[in-house]
């Protein structure tokens, strides 16, 4: 039984530093990209990123640059030189639009006016909305006299929820 003892050098490659910042929330139907530079800013340079729907990184995310569903996804940062990788979660938030349902106010005879801010105009809408009143569907020209509208026409009511998402709907006024 002859034997020889030789020293063996074992080296460990460090895991890459992967920093993940959740992208800002958006309002539906907008999508979110987790491939943008800001999501992995602060990570080691030169990493290759792949995107998954599960923490074990076995189910590839089909379109990581246009995610349309809220949830937790996973980013795998790999150092292609060493083969070492780290998997980190990223949370995507896509907020729903509020429902704004308009009930046109009853016609009035001049000199009477119509108050668009009364609850009966928006009673069937989502709760907790903040309303603004507009002359146009693009919400560029505000309707300053929305509590005393004296001219017939189509105006617009925009409802915004606590997440900042909004929906705008027309309201018909007959004076």
How does the language model describe each region?
Residues 14, 55-57, 81, 137-139, ...:
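Solvent-exposed strand-loop boundary residues in beta-sheet-rich modules
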């Amino acid at each position: 039984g002859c034997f020889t003892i030789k020293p063996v050098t074992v080296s460990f490659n460090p895991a890459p530093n992967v920093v993940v910042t959740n992208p800002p929330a958006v309002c539906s139907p907008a999508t979110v990209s987790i491939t943008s530079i800001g999501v992995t800013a602060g990570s080691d340079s030169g990493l290759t990123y792949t995107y998954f729907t599960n923490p074990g990184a076995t189910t590839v995310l089909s379109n990581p640059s246009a995610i349309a569903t809220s949830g937790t996804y996973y980013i795998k940062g790999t150092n292609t030189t060493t083969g070492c990788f780290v998997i980190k979660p990223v949370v995507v938030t896509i907020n729903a639009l509020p429902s704004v349902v308009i009930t046109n106010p009853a016609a009035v005879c001049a000199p009477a006016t119509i108050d668009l801010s009364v609850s009966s105009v928006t009673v069937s809408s989502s709760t907790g909305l903040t309303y603004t009143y507009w002359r146009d569907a693009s919400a560029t020209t505000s309707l300053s006299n929305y509590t005393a509208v004296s001219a017939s026409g189509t105006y617009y009511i925009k409802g915004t929820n606590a997440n900042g998402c909004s929906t705008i709907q027309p309201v018909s006024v007959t004076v």
